[in-house]
């Protein structure tokens, strides 16, 4: 394949970013998050489509996951606890988070770690980064997804303009610098604050 530019939009473990030698600066949160899918009638109990549960121990986000009664609860726990016994501890979290003892149906659960990181540059020559390849943050508030969509939208305008001669190549430098600045000054701090508030 021969091309003038490459866009790395290949996720938080981006091979493109690594091959360019760009560092991924930031930190990993000490907690483990557990994402769970369940069937339970939250709407009948007055829940909105998205809910933040503020609690020092049982902090969580509860959101509707589809149009057929599937909901997602994502909560945090000590990463030192063994992954093998998550299903046992999950029951305790549900007791604290669900408003009553009516039965629920657990569909799936998955543990994961959360990072707040940003590439040292969103451009390396003819390679540009977008989305999670460029930056990652915790999922609370959907800011990572929104930021990635905005990256794609702006790069989707800038790159064709440069390729077709309607704009100078430095437009791509401006894309890289501005999107990185917005993540470091706005998106990243807002996401970190969302997580901090959950644990109050």
Question: What does each of the following model-derived ranges do?
Answer:
Residues 1-5, 9, 123-126:
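Core beta-strand elements of the Rossmann-like FAD/NAD(P) dinucleotide-binding domain
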Residues 5-114:
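Conserved FAD-binding catalytic core of PHBH/FMO-like flavoproteins
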Residues 8-11, 131-132, 151:
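Acidic active-site catalytic centers that drive phospho-/nucleotidyl reactions
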Residues 18-21, 124, 177:
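Phosphate-coordinating loops and pocket residues in cytosolic domains that bind phosphorylated ligands
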Residues 78, 158-200:
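C-terminal helical "tail/cap" subdomain of flavin- and related membrane-associated enzymes
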Residues 84-141, 147, 167, 186:
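FAD/FMN-dependent oxidoreductases across multiple families
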Residues 141-154, 158-161:
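Basic, amphipathic juxtamembrane/active-site segments
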């Amino acid at each position: 394949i021969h091309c003038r530019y490459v866009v790395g939009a290949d996720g938080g473990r981006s091979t493109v970013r690594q091959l360019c030698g760009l560092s991924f600066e930031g930190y990993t949160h000490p907690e483990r998050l557990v994402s769970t899918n369940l069937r339970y009638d939250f709407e009948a109990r007055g829940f909105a489509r998205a809910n933040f549960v503020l609690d020092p121990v049982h902090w969580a986000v509860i959101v509707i996951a589809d149009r057929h009664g599937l909901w997602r609860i994502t909560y945090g726990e000590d990463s030192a606890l063994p992954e093998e016994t998550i299903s046992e501890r999950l029951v305790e979290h549900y007791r604290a988070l669900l408003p009553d003892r009516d039965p629920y149906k657990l569909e799936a659960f998955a543990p994961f770690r959360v990072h707040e990181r940003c590439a040292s540059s969103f451009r390396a020559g003819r390679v540009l980064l977008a989305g999670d390849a460029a930056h990652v943050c915790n999922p609370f508030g959907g800011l990572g997804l929104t930021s990635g969509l905005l990256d794609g939208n702006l790069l989707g305008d800038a790159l064709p303009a440069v390729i077709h001669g309607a704009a100078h190549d430095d437009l791509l430098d401006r894309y890289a610098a501005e999107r990185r600045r917005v993540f470091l000054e706005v998106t990243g701090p807002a996401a970190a604050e969302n997580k901090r508030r959950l644990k109050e």
